[in-house]
Amino acid sequence: MKRVIAYVDGYNLYHGLKSKGWKRFYWLDIQKLAQQFLKPDQKLVKTRYFTTVVKQPDDKRRRQTVFLDALKTLPDFTIHFGQFLSEIITCRVCGHTYTTYHEKMTDVNISVELMTDASQDRFDIALLLSADSDLVGPVKAVQRLFPAKRVIAVFPPG
């Protein structure tokens, strides 16, 4: 039986679903989603979910917290947190300033866990659910350093 670890870019998945207008899928069972991509000779041994806690508005943060609390009840499921960095933007037309937030560290966290798991022989196959091109380098590194291991990319909608 081949061991599979799923690496899920939660931010990327959410925004892919949102861009398609697929709100009904926001509350996915992430492990069941990952299992849909397995072959009969493969076993999901761990799911790593990468996200960043929403800062504002409060209602979005509350909904995300409830979702993350539900995910924490799943066996062999780990949540890895990045962060949002704030940036003050000034409108070129009217001069109004506002704060915007940029998600940071998700791709770095995925890269670190992917390389750590590969080097410690925790998987035979890595299932990478993300469309982030910043992960091409780490995927190539795993393929180069651990040629017996496979990395399968699954792209979220959007």
Protein language model features and the residues they cover:
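Domain-level signal for Mg2+-assisted phosphodiester chemistry and nucleotide/NA-binding surfaces
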Residues: M1-T100, R150, V154-P157
